[in-house]
């Protein structure tokens, strides 16, 4: 490994790192019931701030994770954010003032902030960074020189060799020698600076490429040593470095969880999920961070992503309902090019526009955050499955969820542990009555879910269900279809997908050829809508004619009786 002589600058840097220590560090793991993180991938800080106020706080998210804030190489590709040039807060997503404003705004909304932190390596190539800093590989003036890099100056090529994985270069990026005291102190100074700006924790990028002992030593210099860390350590069977090595430093992302969800939802039966978690060989629940997809896996294809339709949505519903790990809800943007950077340079003018997917705000997912918070600490109870892709389970006496991943409606009497009374199905906005014995009868349309919890007793105010003034539009359309086709509706409201065919809502064919769906909408809302059909491959065909129009009444549900226009 490289060695650097002790100098006066080292002493000064170490002192600076100590001086920067934040007085109030975050806890070692997400505390309390609010353990869900919204990962707003490549969102500008100003847009993150608005999301904290408008959607994340009200939905009950505990954390928001922001993309790497440090200065990086020039370029529009998303991965430029992961090639640091300096530790100035001067990337494409915003400057230091914008970052601080975002943190303060999110805190005011009750949302803590996690910063994606790139500390394993520096940029390759040469040029001028986004903050004006000149650099070339191995030389980053005022920060690093070649003496601070590992001696291996070639790319990683053998994941069965620990030294190769941790001392050589990840895709040719300059590998920092994190075993050296100066390097540890300088990295800690950067993280402590983020703490002083109000950050509550860190996602450590490429943790697997740094020895666990090095990360432990760095963390000891950050805050008071108990700051929340979530580490990226990808599992690979038979590899020399395993994710479990990092459990002593903080939480570790359990990549097998997401891979297995894809396999089960696409090729197996949901009934297999009955003991999902540690019984599958995963790391301990209390130390694991889980996700359906992240920015790498959605592009690499080893997990589900937004292109997988209801399978993706229902996997998210399951993750948020199931008591394993601390969930990350990835919220990114549409892509066809693997390298494409964020629309508008990261500015989100509105969800579901300009390619922004806003998964964190999808009603099917955001409604489950409140359920998860309500059911925190409750065990899985009253499991039911049909042996295939229809499952249901309770969370003690606090919640109950049913998921229908089949092509026909699920209609049955469910046994829950819920107290008797009225509940709002936060997935559909419909009222459900639970008997004194915990049973209730309901229909769950194909490709949808049902979710009840004690924090949402009514659909017209109270709890965490739809708020005061909420009613619904009941869509009924007579439409004949070919085998494999389904009918959807979309329109100019967020609840209707904002004209995005990928976010269109699937109607229930239980009364075929009449397709039905109830959608919660605020009383008095005027809206436009239109029906479309999708085949098994997801190809969409719109009905003909102009946009349909309607207005929700001030009381009661609006019923629409339509006929498909060929």
Curated annotation (Swiss-Prot):
Catalytic-site annotation from UniProt: 205 (nucleophile), 232 (proton donor)
Signal peptide: 1-28
Intrachain disulfide bonds: none
Catalytically driven reaction(s): Endohydrolysis of (1->4)-alpha-D-glucosidic linkages in polysaccharides containing three or more (1->4)-alpha-linked D-glucose units
SUPFAM superfamilies linked to this entry: (Trans)glycosidases, Glycosyl hydrolase domain, Starch-binding domain-like
Known EC number: 3.2.1.1
UniProt: Ca(2+) binding residues: 120, 166, 175, 209
CC cofactor note: Binds 1 Ca(2+) ion per subunit.
Short name of any one Pfam family annotated for the protein: Alpha-amylase
Cofactor(s) demanded: Ca(2+)
Gene Ontology process terms (BP): carbohydrate metabolic process
InterPro entries xref list: A-amylase/branching_C, A-amylase_C, Alpha_amylase, Carb-bd-like_fold, CBM20, Glyco_hydro_13_cat_dom, Glyco_hydro_b, Glycoside_hydrolase_SF
UniProt keyword annotations, A-Z: Calcium, Carbohydrate metabolism, Glycosidase, Hydrolase, Metal-binding, Signal
Quaternary organization: Monomer.
Family: Belongs to the glycosyl hydrolase 13 family.
This protein's name: Alpha-amylase
Source organism of this protein record: Streptomyces griseus
